């Protein structure tokens, strides 16, 4: 049976930590229209979520290096290019194959002033050996050279190739990741080619894109991190539960996160479109995956559409997705992973 997160426990823990040890949270940037939640009463449910302690640099923990930006011209989407950054942990050893994690909407996952701050989380979890040593790639949606780079305030829904790449249920974005990005990474870094050691994740449209990559290419990616996934009828994403039920099971592990105050497709006139209800469709995804015997976990909270809830549960998502990585039982092997002490925080 998959282990389900206790949202109540997470909220209480996050609240207590925020009052005792965690620095005040960085105010979030305003989302674009596609990410802006509908009003849901006087109380903002996102206020109950705080950055996890592991989203902060910790004393004594060596920091990884985030390299880039780099530009990746696309053959799958001619005339466009993808900007990406590569996170290399302090513990990376070129002689030992590392695991791999890809983050769609990379700027939103790596921004130091953002909600997730994935590079700090990975610094801390790798140091404590709660996840394997892994290279991470923060990749933005494709755009033409004359279009602006996505930012925390503008994820690119109106002025990049994001809607076509992320929401369409075909294999073209998987080709960007597998056929265009991976060969570049393999040339530069010693990354394991075992698909069990490859993960991909994202938020909103970036989450359904992550699932599509693993669905199309389970020979390359078998771990999916999905936050407020757009499994809705933007471009047919609400069909996935039925597709899952009708298809042979694939060796994919999935962690889904969403909140009851996500976009619920309620119009001012009282009409309701179930196919565009984010929370409902995420629950449908979990049910379909469970019925087919997938390794699936989920956390249903009260958050809106965005990354506020994710900032609390993100470390646990990584731990769960990578829970079966190798563990040393040598009684003399008790020191945290600190290969490069020169990068320890000051």
Residue ranges and their predicted role:
Residues 10:
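Short coil/turn motifs at helix boundaries and re-entrant loops, enriched in small/polar
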Residues 1-7:
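Bacterial N-terminal signal peptides that target proteins for export
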Residues 19-346:
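Non-catalytic cap/lid and distal C-terminal segments of serine-dependent acyl enzymes
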Residues 13-15:
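N-terminal signal peptide c-region/cleavage motif recognized by signal peptidases
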């Amino acid at each position: 049976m998959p282990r389900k997160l206790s949202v109540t426990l997470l909220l209480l823990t996050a609240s207590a930590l925020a009052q005792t040890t965690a620095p005040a949270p960085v105010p979030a940037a305003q989302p674009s229209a596609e990410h802006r939640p509908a009003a849901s009463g006087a109380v903002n449910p996102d206020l109950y979520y705080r950055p996890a302690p592991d989203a902060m640099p910790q004393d004594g923990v060596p920091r990884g290096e985030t390299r880039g930006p780099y530009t990746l011209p696309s053959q799958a989407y001619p005339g466009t290019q993808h900007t990406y950054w590569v996170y290399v942990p302090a513990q990376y050893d070129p002689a030992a194959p590392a695991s791999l994690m890809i983050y769609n909407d990379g700027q939103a996952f790596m921004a130091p002033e953002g909600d997730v701050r994935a590079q700090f989380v990975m610094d801390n979890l790798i140091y404590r050996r709660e996840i394997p040593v892994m290279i991470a790639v923060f990749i933005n949606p494709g755009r033409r050279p004359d279009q602006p780079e996505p930012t925390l305030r503008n994820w690119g829904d109106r002025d990049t190739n994001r809607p076509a790449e992320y929401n369409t249920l075909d294999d073209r974005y998987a080709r960007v990741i597998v056929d265009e990005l991976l060969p570049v990474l393999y040339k530069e870094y010693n990354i394991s080619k075992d698909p069990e050691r490859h993960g991909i994740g994202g938020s909103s449209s970036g989450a359904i894109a992550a699932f599509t990559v693993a669905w199309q290419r389970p020979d390359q990616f078998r771990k999916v991190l999905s936050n407020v996934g757009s499994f809705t009828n933007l471009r047919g994403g609400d069909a996935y539960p039925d597709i899952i039920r009708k298809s042979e099971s694939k060796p994919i592990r999935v962690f889904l996160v969403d909140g009851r105050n996500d976009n619920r497709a309620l119009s001012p006139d009282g009409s309701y479109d179930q196919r565009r209800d984010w929370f409902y469709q995420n629950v449908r995804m979990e049910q379909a995956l469970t019925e087919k015997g997938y390794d699936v976990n989920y956390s249903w909270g009260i958050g809106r559409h965005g990354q506020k809830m994710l900032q609390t549960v993100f470390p646990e998502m990584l731990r769960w997705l990578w829970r079966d990585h190798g563990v040393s039982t040598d009684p003399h092997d008790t020191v945290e992973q600190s290969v490069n002490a020169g990068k320890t925080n000051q």
